[in-house]
């Protein structure tokens, strides 16, 4: 059905106790140059991944609402991905399936919506302005369209600063999962003014 402007999916409120599960510690130590060959190689290794999936904890905190959910993210091809949000009880709150030119979202009532812009759809239906188009790169440890960023001492992203559509996002990476090759982000925090988005990845499967 067409995407309405007024409908909001009501996710369960965020319990105060879960905030620590998504805490982010800024990496210490000197950073590396974005022009380094090691950083270029790391980016290329990540971009060469054809398929990947991760699951973990999601928190959104603002003056208007606090939301906690479990998430599952699966990329099956270029611009083909699936995002699933479940509440702490394990029930599905929303499922989003995207492919070039078409995005479908099913809410917690089983209602189906279609659009050509996943980021706009998520924002209208949940009230959370998640920068999904950029997050698809950031969650992999890639800067996307951002040109203002810093690396850690292992030639991986540690911070991103990015402005678009009136939003000024700062992304801080708290660590990487070195059990995968290439190493993938283990947790991250996005902030824009009074809004915070926290992601903690439990594990990665990459191909």
Swiss-Prot record:
Main location: membrane
Residues anchoring lipid (N-palmitoyl cysteine): 22
InterPro entries: LolA/LolB/LppX, OM_lipoprot_LolB
Signal peptide: 1-21
Keyword field: Cell outer membrane, Chaperone, Lipoprotein, Membrane, Palmitate, Protein transport, Signal, Transport
GO biological process, one term: protein transport
Location of this chain's protein in the cell: Cell outer membrane
CC annotations in GO: cell outer membrane
S-diacylglycerol cysteine: lipidated positions: 22
Membrane disposition: Lipid-anchor
Pfam family, one: LolB
Subunit structure of this chain's protein: Monomer.
Role: Plays a critical role in the incorporation of lipoproteins in the outer membrane after they are released by the LolA protein.
HAMAP family membership: LolB
NCBIfam families per record: lolB
Protein family per UniProt: Belongs to the LolB family.
Name of the protein described by the UniProt record: Outer-membrane lipoprotein LolB
């Amino acid at each position: 059905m067409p995407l309405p402007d007024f409908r909001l999916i009501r996710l369960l409120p965020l319990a105060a106790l879960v905030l620590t599960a998504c805490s982010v510690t800024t990496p210490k130590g000197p950073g590396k140059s974005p022009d380094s060959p090691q950083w270029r190689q790391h980016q290329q290794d990540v971009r060469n991944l054809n398929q990947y999936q991760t699951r973990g904890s999601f928190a959104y905190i603002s003056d208007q609402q606090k939301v906690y959910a479990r998430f599952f993210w699966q990329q099956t091809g270029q611009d083909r991905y699936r995002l699933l949000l479940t509440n702490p009880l394990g029930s599905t709150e929303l499922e989003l399936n995207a492919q070039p030119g078409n995005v479908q979202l099913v809410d917690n009532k089983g209602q189906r919506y279609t659009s050509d812009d996943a980021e706009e759809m998520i924002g209208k239906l949940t009230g959370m302005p998640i920068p999904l188009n950029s997050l698809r790169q950031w969650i992999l440890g890639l800067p996307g369209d951002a040109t203002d960023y810093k690396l850690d001492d292992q030639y991986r992203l540690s911070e991103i600063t990015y402005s678009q559509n009136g939003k000024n996002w700062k992304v801080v990476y708290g660590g990487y999962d070195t059990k995968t090759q290439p190493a993938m982000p283990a947790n991250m925090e996005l902030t824009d003014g009074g809004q915070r988005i926290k992601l903690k990845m439990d594990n990665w499967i990459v191909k």
